[in-house]
Regions:
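Beta-hairpin (beta-strand-turn-beta-strand) motif
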Residues: 74-75, 120, 129
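Mid-chain, well-packed structural core segment of small domains
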Residues: 49-73
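Acidic, metal-coordinating catalytic segment for phosphate/diphosphate chemistry
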Residues: 1-4, 65-114
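Conserved N-terminal beta-strand and adjoining loop/helix that marks the start
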Residues: 1-17, 101-124, 141
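Conserved Nudix-box catalytic region and its N-terminal flanking loop in Nudix hydrolases
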Residues: 11-50, 123-147
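Alpha-helix initiation/capping motif
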Residues: 41-44, 97, 117
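A residue-identity detector for tryptophan
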Residues: 38, 54, 80, 84-86, ...
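Hydrophobic transmembrane signal anchors and adjacent membrane-proximal interface regions, especially
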Residues: 9, 37-39, 49, 62, ...
Length: 147
């Protein structure tokens, strides 16, 4: 049975996921198609056991049928979570519990650029992504945002 309250820890586009026994961090596999759910967000106790300190943010209640789950959003106080999974991988791996997939989906920003910087040659300022899921791709300057 999935825990009623879980913790959504995100750092630079990476998320902490655990297996059904609370062991982690675990990675997602994009496009995985299985009938078994193996991965989920950790509980408060599991985050504490992993020795991760974090700053609490907002809470989100998600309803699935007659069940309500509380997702506690927070920012981990760590450097780079190298072994955590990429946020972008979570939504396409159905071994991830629907609570985690829905929480990630709701956290995705639909941004519209209001400003584009052009030079005298009418060229647009672009930035090449240096790390992360979109490493090597070009886009408008920016980065991951929390809300």
């Amino acid at each position: 049975m999935h825990p009623r309250t879980v913790v959504y820890l995100e750092h630079d586009g990476k998320l902490l996921l655990v297996d059904e026994s609370g062991n982690g961090p675990k990675d997602c596999i994009m496009g995985r198609n299985t009938n078994e759910v193996w991965l989920r967000f950790p509980t408060l106790e599991e985050v504490e056991y992993l020795g991760i300190t974090w700053t609490a943010g907002r809470e989100t209640d998600l309803r699935f049928g007659n069940e309500t789950y509380t997702v506690l959003h927070g920012e981990p106080e760590i450097d780079w979570p190298e072994h955590w999974t990429w946020k972008d991988k979570v939504v396409s791996d159905n071994a991830v519990h629907p609570v985690a997939r829905e929480a990630v989906y709701r956290s995705l920003h639909r941004l519209v650029s209001k400003v584009i910087i052009r030079n005298d040659k009418n060229e647009i300022l672009m930035a090449k992504v240096e790390r992360g899921f979109f490493k090597g791709y070009w886009g408008l300057p920016g980065g991951y945002m929390n809300h």
